[in-house]
């Protein structure tokens, strides 16, 4: 073989190798680019102040998603009420302004009146996911709010009436009470004059005497400083707080199976932990309130029973009035047989 022929063969092999290498690099680049393109970042907001009782479970959920979802899905947490007023969260989620929301049914009744029914649940979420209650509500969320109800992160957390004036019976005549839709029907039935404000305005309302009291769960008043302006808590508690993670359905439908799996895993963990976590939180804040000088008003047995009965009676009447189509059916799922 001549030297020229050998040179040509060698050069041909080198060119072929270079072409294969270039193709390999191109394929690798395409694969990497494709993998990176699959990661999606969702915008999230909370209806409650950051790092407070009713946002902490959501923030733990976000941390889990961002840890497990690297390269797959991430959540950009834009904040709480300073980023978006609580009563605007439902519509923002529905229209896709945000992809994920941590909110409560009381703040989304302007979009879906049935969402307030969660407060009346007498069964844990584990049971509602089996008896059809969750599925029934999930269908309404999809239809009315364009939302996926992912998980309930607050449960087993009773509401109470807090006052700055003592009462001896379940009668709020002459008192101005701050409310959200949670308590409106109940407190009005007890004779109260009701005033609706976002949580961020309650402290000032108490300080200035705009209201004489408010409804709120057993936990969380220390986060907001309300204990400084509160003298009494009325027992027994009633209803149960609900704070849940919702996902815009249009966004959800575009996610891959792997992305949905990351969200579902974090959501299921959070929901499974909620009951035990709030049992501990309830006990801790009950003691903390006593230590802070908040006195307990306790009705006698008959008055206490009447108080709770009226709470649920007026609560369900309100839900059924707002949603004749679904209210009675939701009650079947949520209530315990008497």
Locate the predicted segments by residue.
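Bacterial N-terminal signal peptides that target proteins for export
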Residues: 3-23
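Sec/Tat signal peptide C-region and signal peptidase I cleavage site
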Residues: 31-37
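Intrinsic disorder/low-complexity segments
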Residues: 4, 30-31
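N-terminal secretory/targeting leader peptides
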Residues: 23-26, 38-127, 139-338
């Amino acid at each position: 073989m001549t030297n020229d022929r050998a040179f040509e063969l060698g050069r041909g092999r080198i060119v072929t190798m270079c072409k294969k290498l270039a193709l390999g690099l191109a394929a690798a680049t395409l694969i990497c680019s494709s993998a990176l393109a699959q990661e999606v970042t969702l915008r999230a907001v909370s209806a409650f102040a950051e790092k407070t009782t009713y946002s902490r479970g959501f923030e733990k959920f976000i941390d889990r998603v961002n840890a497990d979802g690297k390269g797959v899905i991430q959540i950009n947490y834009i904040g709480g009420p300073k980023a978006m007023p609580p009563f605007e969260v439902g519509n923002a989620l529905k229209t896709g302004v945000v992809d994920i929301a941590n909110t409560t049914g009381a703040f989304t009744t302007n979009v879906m009146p049935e969402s307030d029914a969660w407060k009346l649940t007498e069964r844990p979420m584990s049971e509602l996911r089996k008896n059809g209650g969750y599925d029934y509500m999930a269908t309404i969320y999809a239809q009315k709010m364009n939302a996926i109800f992912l998980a309930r992160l607050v449960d087993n957390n009773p509401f109470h009436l807090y006052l700055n004036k003592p009462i001896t019976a379940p009668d709020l005549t002459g008192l101005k009470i701050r409310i959200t839709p949670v308590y409106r029907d109940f407190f009005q039935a007890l004779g109260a004059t009701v005033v609706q404000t976002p949580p961020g305005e309650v402290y000032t309302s108490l300080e200035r005497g705009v209201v004489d009291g408010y409804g709120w769960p057993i936990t969380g008043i220390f986060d907001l400083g309300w204990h400084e302006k509160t003298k009494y808590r009325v027992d027994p508690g009633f209803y149960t707080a609900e704070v849940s993670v919702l996902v815009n359905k249009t966004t959800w439908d575009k996610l891959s199976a792997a992305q949905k799996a990351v969200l579902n895993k974090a959501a299921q963990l959070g929901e499974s932990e909620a009951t035990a976590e709030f049992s501990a939180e309830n006990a801790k804040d009950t003691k903390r309130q006593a230590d802070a000088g908040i006195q307990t008003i306790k009705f006698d047995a008959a008055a206490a029973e009447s108080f709770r009965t009226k709470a649920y009676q007026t609560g369900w009447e309100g839900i059924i009035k707002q949603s004749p189509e679904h209210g009675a059916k939701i009650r079947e799922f949520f209530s315990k047989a008497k």
